[in-house]
């Protein structure tokens, strides 16, 4: 299947000489939720801005549903909705007016029924006649999503969609994103909340230093790069680990009351059997144990550190 977005060898150098992107290649599949992760300055917003036609690329090509973003600008832009990171809204306009106006900017005919549908799905219907300046930060962000959806785009970019939003509203946003995907909208999000990507994304892309350093299915990424930890809760506190256990690369934690063993989930052998045998020989007894899996945040931090 042809990707809905194809980025090929894209580079961007600003007038100041800053090289923001370096030969980026990326394909986005139709109907997926794709999370683009990376530290500040990695190039995420620049890449999104290029695809959306806001920033001009220096080298390379970008196509949307087979249309070139430069040659077929109006066609590609009409397929894309963008929710920016900043809360840029018309403070003195009503919710209804600003969403309807956004639809008109893309040359779409008036469609009150569709605008009403969007506002209801985003829980904005009761505030449709309210001036935007009277809304909370979370509601203003919903208005931005409504504006981005006003012209019925096939693709929705969410740049830090839950920045400054409380936990309850963040989970509401997650539900909104899932519902949009269920309707066939392709969604690309950038986020500093790694749990957000872990919760929603089908695939993960990681950027660092203006480059894409990894693109992987989320489940496969966590399987390949994730590690597990075995935590042993000791019967008696230890001041230090015996030299006989040095080969296991253990960590003494919880003020000497826990031993933590980290192992690779891809290894043929975990080493747990040998560890338990050596603990027994060393006279170390434990009262309980449990295992934990690396989170996406652990994997992301590890990938970025490798590049530093």
What feature does the model see in each segment?
Residues 100, 104-127:
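Conserved ABC ATPase "signature" region
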Residues 131-135:
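Conserved ABC ATPase signature
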Residues 152:
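Conserved catalytic motifs of ABC-family nucleotide-binding domains
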Residues 156-159:
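Catalytic Walker B motif of ABC-type/P-loop ATPase nucleotide-binding domains
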Residues 174-264:
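ABC transporter nucleotide-binding domain
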Residues 230-303, 307:
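Short, charged/small-residue-rich alpha-helical element at the C-terminal edge
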